[in-house]
Amino acid sequence: MKPSIHSLVHQTMQEWVLEQGEKKFRADQIWEWLYRKRVQSFEEMTNLSKDLIAKLNDQFVVNPLKQRIVQESADGTVKYLFELPDGMLIETVLMRQHYGLSVCVTTQVGCNIGCTFCASGLIKKQRDLNNGEIVAQIMLVQKYFDERGQDERISHIVVMGIGEPFDNYNNVLNFFRTINDDKGMAIGARHITVSTSGLAHKIRDFADEGVQVNLAVSLHAPNNELRSSIMKINRAFPIEKLFAAIEYYIETTNRRVTFEYIMLNEVNDGVEQALELTELLKNIKKLSYVNLIPYNPVSEHDQYSRSPKECVLAFYDTLKKKGVNCVVRQEHGTDIDAACGQLRSNTMKRDRQKAVAAVNP
């Protein structure tokens, strides 16, 4: 199985070109064809020699993904189901925001974090995506607009799809390098956000990288007992260890951290929990931001339901009165398989049902 050309960061592409006996500037030409002109085949790279095109075709593919399903919401959200070369399925979501087009990418096939409210973890991690498979999600979403003649360009990226990004650390970092490259897609680092469920040691590593990418932490509970009951990762990285890493990140980078907090009815949405959260954030209040997330129900996790609006507002008001910066996240795609992992999970169910029906007509 040939790798995608998108797996090469700019420097690696320069090295590959030199290994082929070509001049270094050829790498810049290939890069421009891929990320500025966004071609779908090497044959479209008309300023390259036939010999170099043949070498590219022999060693790489341009697009490693196959589009299986596209769902468009009334609010402009678009959800994509892509098939990988090995037949595995992943999801990508485009969201229209007031500040531009934002794409949520997946970094792993399945997830081992095991959050008890999440559709992504219904299927355990099968493998990491390589850099090229993550980049290709962005390129195919952009192609969706290019083909329609819509003069719109992806401006923001959130790494919050299926999987734990910091469990696929090096591929995710190379993804950042590729899409941030000023000769390519040139998406600013401050327009990119990566979300972790709390791998404390990787948060420290990320602080030391010196990149300008934004950090979000999936917190979802203000104390260890509650967090461990809904997020098993808290047993390995309890709140004390997690917040020591977060404080190190803030001291090292002087950058704000966003805390994701999903609102689960009668689980973590009480004023008591809001007060606990303000206490937890008191030392980093100036550089923290809480994102309150309305819950998208998942049939396999029917023990949970969405917090009533009045509970969300009471929680929000409590944080605000204590000086915590917070917002209630705007919902997207509520009329399609909205929750992360739902489209993939539902498609896999239907595929299994078809297979069983074929065996037992």
From Swiss-Prot:
Gene Ontology biological-process entries: rRNA base methylation; tRNA methylation
Active site as annotated: 91 (proton acceptor), 340 (s-methylcysteine intermediate)
Transmembrane segments: none
Record text on cofactor binding: Binds 1 [4Fe-4S] cluster. The cluster is coordinated with 3 cysteines and an exchangeable S-adenosyl-L-methionine.
Keyword annotations from UniProtKB, A to Z: 4Fe-4S, Cytoplasm, Disulfide bond, Iron, Iron-sulfur, Metal-binding, Methyltransferase, rRNA processing, S-adenosyl-L-methionine, Transferase, tRNA processing
Any GO CC annotation of this UniProt entry: cytoplasm
GO molecular function: 4 iron, 4 sulfur cluster binding; metal ion binding; rRNA (adenine(2503)-C2-)-methyltransferase activity; rRNA binding; tRNA (adenine(37)-C2)-methyltransferase activity; tRNA binding
HAMAP family: RNA_methyltr_RlmN (MF_01849)
Additional observations: Reaction proceeds by a ping-pong mechanism involving intermediate methylation of a conserved cysteine residue.
Listed name of the protein: Probable dual-specificity RNA methyltransferase RlmN
Organism of this sequence: Streptococcus pneumoniae serotype 4 (strain ATCC BAA-334 / TIGR4)
